[in-house]
From Swiss-Prot:
Residues 8-282 form the tr-type G domain. SUPFAM superfamilies: EF-G C-terminal domain-like (SSF54980), P-loop containing nucleoside triphosphate hydrolases (SSF52540), Ribosomal protein S5 domain 2-like (SSF54211), Translation proteins (SSF50447). Signal peptide: none annotated. The gene is fusA. GO terms for cellular component: cytoplasm. It comes from Alkaliphilus metalliredigens (strain QYMF). Catalyzes the GTP-dependent ribosomal translocation step during translation elongation. During this step, the ribosome changes from the pre-translocational (PRE) to the post-translocational (POST) state as the newly formed A-site-bound peptidyl-tRNA and P-site-bound deacylated tRNA move to the P and E sites, respectively. Catalyzes the coordinated movement of the two tRNA molecules, the mRNA and conformational changes in the ribosome. One of its GO terms (biological process) is ribosome disassembly. GO terms for molecular function: GTP binding; GTPase activity; translation elongation factor activity. This is Elongation factor G.
């Protein structure tokens, strides 16, 4: 089957936003207008097409990025709906890796909210071209221009209006197109009947002013247009469109649209914009990877004739077909039934069937081409972030880096029979989500689950019950503390057993040096003159790494230190790798005791949005939780407090905040850094463990 849509008519976009900005509703409307859905699903009625997991329908939030494909103006648009809740930032992060562009949805009233900033920064990190959609223009307090200003102040973005709203709140009746300089008026409440008219008299001056701003912003994207602009020549509509497209793709400008997805206003025009201004796979730089054989850097271009390469960006357990691996094809083509190499793991895999997804219905397709997003059935060893490629031309694409979990709870099944089922369920859920870990606590033999926040773990437990029918009881949340050293020391350790028979002998001298927070562990060898033979050096490193899993204060992992192996001795007959491994571990434990060990705890960056009346209470409460207030600002009638607070003090915060502010304040938090625990508190942790 030949390619249905050429590459230049393919768009891979994400829809990203803060919770409740109307992201899922916007995606729904896109699917409706592009003829993919028969009826509209309302998120607040729990019937949305994209939110297809039970928990999502119940909570009205999007948890997993559903990948969907639709058609508009003879283009294929692949859409990834990303979650807006901070516990699921990994979903956003991994979708942004495989997209070519994104539509950021902002609420016309709330504007740039905390999660919008997080998501926007992730977009900056991957240099994703973006356009903005100011949604909910029909809401009380909607203010298009305020949102534009907030994008400049809070996101350091360069928003450029390509549309202006006609009226707002109840009076939102149409949209001005600043490129064509005409207006679309909505004649009914549901946005079905429209009429193109001249720009209303009272808005002409404003439209001319913003058209001028648009032309100026566009002229800065190329020298040719700049010359024309400076000479006072008018830009043609064609030049303007080309300039907006170029500026968007180069991440110089962010075109801003407006509308009300719920009332069906502005969505078709937004789709026109996606086709006109979002990049095709040909517009973005080639993806670079490492040649699996030579280890040299190579590039893969969006071209069907190049060797096949793809990135698996999501694994999902599907009740009907088993394990589904969503992947983005960067180069080449792939047929169902063929073999690929998972170059990350060095394993060959057979692709059973290839499915193109629409929220949670699917169509089987025989072939995928460069630039496509699809899901494969039959991949056993593939996990998130793995590269799939042509077995005869192996490449490893840059993988994704996921944050470590910061919160853990003990979990046990309510019945004996549930034990095995729970093991299977947790393993499947961990395969899907790289930020979710599960392990057995060696001391207590309890099963521990760890993740990015309380909501994250709640949803895991919920899914176990719904999808795997395992009921479980959950313990109190535990914080992932770490240990470190605070001063440099030199230690030596000798492991010798030489009484009769084959002996053991290993002798090491090491320096342990504290590192900057977040650096992790580093090992260097500076021995000279063969005092320790080369083949035993890795064993010393292994011994230290084995011992650092359990620190001496409270048994937590030891981080942020450097070990220099600078001397030692060996025995021709009795030395072995094992002996040096044990000597390394003994030296580490001795060094740890001498190096003034300290406990570290995770600090969260917390942002609370509260009405002014409760500000004193909220700040007082954060201080009592050992919070460090970082700053305050006012935002559309509310006060925003930013602080760093230890995670251990944040359990149950949402309930406390609700009662302190009568439910009027909201907060978001995400992991920021590890810092030393004050002595008085570390005492409690050590005795309480």
């Amino acid at each position: 089957m030949p390619r249905e849509f050429p590459l230049e008519r393919t768009r891979n976009i994400g829809i990203m936003a803060h919770i409740d900005a109307g992201k899922t509703t916007t995606t729904e409307r896109i699917l409706f207008y592009s003829g993919t859905t028969r009826k509209l699903g309302e998120t607040h009625e729990g019937a949305s097409q994209m939110d297809w997991m039970d928990q999502e329908k119940e909570r009205g939030i999007t948890i997993t990025s559903a990948a969907t494909t639709c058609q508009w103006l003879n283009h294929r648009v692949n859409i990834i709906d990303t979650p807006g809740h901070v516990d699921f930032t990994v979903e956003v992060e991994r979708s942004l890796r495989v997209l070519d562009g994104a539509v950021a949805v902002f609420c016309a009233k709330g504007g740039v909210e905390p999660q919008s900033e997080t998501v926007w920064r992730q977009g900056d990190k991957y240099k994703v071209p973006r356009m903005a959609f100011v949604n909910k223009m029909d809401r009380q307090g909607a203010d298009f221009f305020n949102v534009m200003q907030m994008m400049i102040d809070r996101l350091a973005a360069n928003p450029v209006a390509v549309q202006l709203p006609i009226g707002s709140e109840e009076e939102f009746t149409g949209i001005i197109d600043l490129v064509k300089m005409e207006a679309t008026i909505y004649l009914d409440d549901v946005g079905q009947e429209t009429k193109i008219v001249e720009i209303p008299e009272e808005l002409k001056e404003l439209a001319v002013e913003y058209r001028e701003k648009l032309v100026e912003a566009v002229s800065e994207t190329s020298e040719e247009l700049m010359m024309k602009y400076l000479e006072g020549e008018a830009l043609t509509e064609e030049e303007l469109v080309k300039g907006i497209r170029q500026g968007t793709i180069n991440v110089q400008i962010t075109p801003v649209y407006c509308g009300s997805a719920y009332k069906n206003k502005g969505v078709q025009l937004l789709l026109d914009g996606v086709v006109a201004y979002m990049p095709s796979p040909l517009d973005i730089p080639a993806i670079s990877g490492i040649d699996a054989d030579t280890q040299e850097e190579i590039e893969r271009h969006a071209d069907d004739s190049e060797p096949f390469s793809a990135l698996a960006f999501k694994i999902m357990a599907d009740p009907y077909v088993g394990k589904l691996a969503f992947f983005r094809v960067y180069s080449g083509t792939l047929d169902a039934g063929s073999y690929v190499l998972n170059s990350t793991k060095g394993k060959k895999e057979r692709i059973g069937r290839i499915l193109q997804m629409h929220a949670n219905t699917r169509a089987e397709i025989p072939t995928v081409y460069a630039g496509d997003i699809a899901a494969a059935v039959g991949l056993k060893d593939t996990t998130t972030g793995d590269t799939l490629c042509d077995p005869t031309d192996a490449v490893i694409l840059e993988s994704m880096v996921f944050p470590e979990p910061v919160i853990s709870v003990a979990i046990e099944p309510k019945t004996k029979a549930g034990q095995e089922k729970m093991g299977v369920a947790l393993q499947k859920l961990a395969e899907e989500d790289p930020t979710f870990k599960t392990y057995t606590d060696e001391e207590t033999s309890q099963t521990i689950i760890a993740g990015m926040g309380e909501l994250h773990l709640e949803i895991i437990v919920d899914r176990m019950m719904r999808e795997f029918k395992v009921e479980a009881t959950v313990g109190k949340p535990q914080v992932a503390y770490k240990e470190t050293i605070t001063k440099a020391v030199e230690v030596e350790a000798k492991y010798a057993k030489q009484s009769g028979g084959r002996g053991q002998y290993g002798h090491v001298k090491i320096r342990m040096i504290p590192q900057e927070p977040g650096i992790g562990y580093e090992f260097t060898n500076s021995t000279v003159g063969g005092s320790i033979p080369r083949e035993y050096v890795p064993a010393v490193d292994q011994g230290i790494q084995g011992a650092m899993v359990n620190g001496i204060l409270a048994g937590y992992e030891v981080v942020d230190f450097k070990v220099e192996l600078y001397d030692g001795s060996y025995h021709d007959v009795d030395s072995s790798e094992m002996a040096f491994k044990i000597a390394g571990s003994m030296a580490f434990k001795e060094g740890m005791r001498k190096a003034s060990p300290a406990l570290l705890e995770p600090y969260m960056k917390v942002e609370v949005v509260t009405p002014e009346d409760y500000m004193g209470d909220v700040i007082g409460d954060l201080n009592s939780r050992r919070g460090q207030i970082e700053g305050m600002e006012s935002r559309s009638g509310a006060q925003v407090i930013k602080a760093f607070v230890p995670l251990s003090e944040m359990f149950g915060y949402s309930t406390d905040l609700r009662s302190k502010t009568q439910g009027r304040a909201t907060y978001s938090m995400h992991f920021n850094h590890y810092a030393q625990v004050p002595a008085s508190i570390s005492e409690k942790i050590m005795t309480g463990k």
